[in-house]
Swiss-Prot record:
Similarity-based family: Belongs to the UPF0656 family.
Source domain of life: Eukaryota
Record's subcellular location: Cytoplasm; Nucleus
Native species: Schizosaccharomyces pombe (strain 972 / ATCC 24843)
Keywords: Cytoplasm, Nucleus
One GO term describing the cellular component: nucleus
Protein name: UPF0656 protein C926.02
Primary location group: cytoplasm
SUPFAM superfamilies: TPR-like (SSF48452)
Amino acid sequence: MSFSRNQVLKGLKTKKAKPKKNPTVDELFEIAIDLEESGDRWRLEPAKCLRFYQKSLETYDRYLLQCPNDFDARFNKARLLLNMATNCDMLYKDSQVCLQKSIEMHKHALLLQEAPDIWFNLAQVHLNLAEIWVDLDREDLAYPEIQQALQSISHSIDLQERERIEWENTIQTSSQQKYEEIPDIQARRLYFIEADKEASTLVTEIASLACSCKLLEESDFEKLCQIMLPITEKLDILKLMDWYLAKTKRLVLGGKENEVAWIDLLQVFDHQLSQLPQLNLQNPLDPNSSVKPLHIQLLCDKADAYIDFAETLLDSCVSTEESASIEIMTRAWNMLGVAAKSLKMANTYNPNHVRILISRADLEIQRAAIPIMVAQNSKLVLYKNAKVLYEKAFRDYSTKKTTRTFAEIVLKHYQLQKLTNPETIKMLDSLTEVAQEDILNTI
């Protein structure tokens, strides 16, 4: 998820005025900001969010025609393109176009001025592109983006630290009288602390993805471990789990760690869940309801971790003797069963969470594909469960037909029918060939 930074923008309005037919240059800038903020407020409605963002983009373009060297406008447009890709649930093809344009706009802005925030956002753009390429099974294209993301966030951290040191020196060298004149000392100090946490979180996300890449050389892996060492002291365990899991998986597969280390790490999720207060789902005024999102996130993260472990076990069966292979596949089946229970519990906390419904359906199909007796005996039930889950997701998302998620639901439901009842296949809704191809590339 994007958490791109905003700068303090010139001329930001506190009171909205009715737009004029022929706005001045400064008014164009303010209108673009208003439209962008309106899009932000409609993030839960991707189509409406996209319409506001597109109008904002057009307005920034009109402004930049008259003020091509305005850093704030270029910064805003670069960020807006990033947010379009991350907030509007577009097809990967369209997201990639937005992200590539965002890179170009970031580079134009950097020619005008270097700032930590723009390097930070640029790192996010490269990371988002890398994640799309990984999903498309193109690690050869993902890895250069990961490298660019690491370079960009390193620039951001260096500039941020330089700013912090200069600011601290200003305070220390000021006399008592001048010291009192320095505005918002505490607020500025908190800003640097928060910026450091954000940067550490982003580095962790990039390092986790890098660690899962086969193209990562051993020397680069060791450098990543050194980079992450101080970060592990700044962030809590939940924000570090992706890194720990990716690192441990690499060490286990490389024969440098015992499998037990990976299994022990999976237990962290249960420990963290046990620390959270219990929720009363029957009581809408439950005082513990504020921790519900954390429950859901932990359960989904736990499911992802168990699925990854199971998939690694299944991959290892290719070069294993038949008797041992059956034992390994049975372990994978059990792991996927744990993941299924976690997702079901997460769905209990939020029955209409479409991504959880899709993940549950995907998992049922994955379990049915394991060539062992228990899976084959359960196949029809698992397929039926998946069909029901896709159809519920479709009903909950039927008004969002322009999104990638909608296309994913429709096509996965269609593909499932090919496995269960190929004689009477019917699509839930029509899809363009472009949308079908976009989804098929990731199934």
